[in-house]
Amino acid sequence: MAGKRVIASGDKASSKKPKTEKQSDHELHWALNETEKKRITLSEFRGTRYVHIREYYEKDGDMLPGKKGIALNINEWKKLKQLIHEVDDSLGLVDSGSDSEDEIKEKAENNASLKNDEDDLNTKTENKTDDSSVEN
């Protein structure tokens, strides 16, 4: 009977997968929506820390992680954070800390004015240099 499992009388073969450990209460998590079904969770597995972005479901009063989601190691998380600004720009989103349209226009006008002043100064300096070379 090689390769077959022998079941003693009274024993039942279990077709269920072994239960996984419930999410511990000390893991940090942040809800992405009002129902808390989408979360960012920090965890550690085999000595490696992960940031999970995952959908959860409720079963028997407990919120359990679902299949939909992704686990990022620390390097992947850092890269995602670097890309967020580019994604925001592509979506046309404005950061709340950024300047308003009026402030941007004012800065552009000031920069243009400074550029004109700089050009005028350079022109005057060139004219003085030309005048001094004529005198010699």
From Swiss-Prot:
Keywords: Activator, DNA-binding, Nucleus, Phosphoprotein, Transcription, Transcription regulation. GO terms for biological process: positive regulation of RNA polymerase II transcription preinitiation complex assembly. Its main location: nucleus. It is found in: Nucleus. Residues 1-30, 92-136 are annotated as: Disordered. This is Putative RNA polymerase II transcriptional coactivator. GO terms for cellular component: nucleus; transcription regulator complex. It comes from Schizosaccharomyces pombe (strain 972 / ATCC 24843) (Fission yeast). It comes from the Eukaryota. PANTHER family: RNA POLYMERASE II TRANSCRIPTIONAL COACTIVATOR. Pfam families: PC4. GO terms for molecular function: double-stranded DNA binding; single-stranded DNA binding; transcription coactivator activity. Belongs to the transcriptional coactivator PC4 family. InterPro entries: PC4_C, ssDNA-bd_transcriptional_reg, Sub1/Tcp4-like.
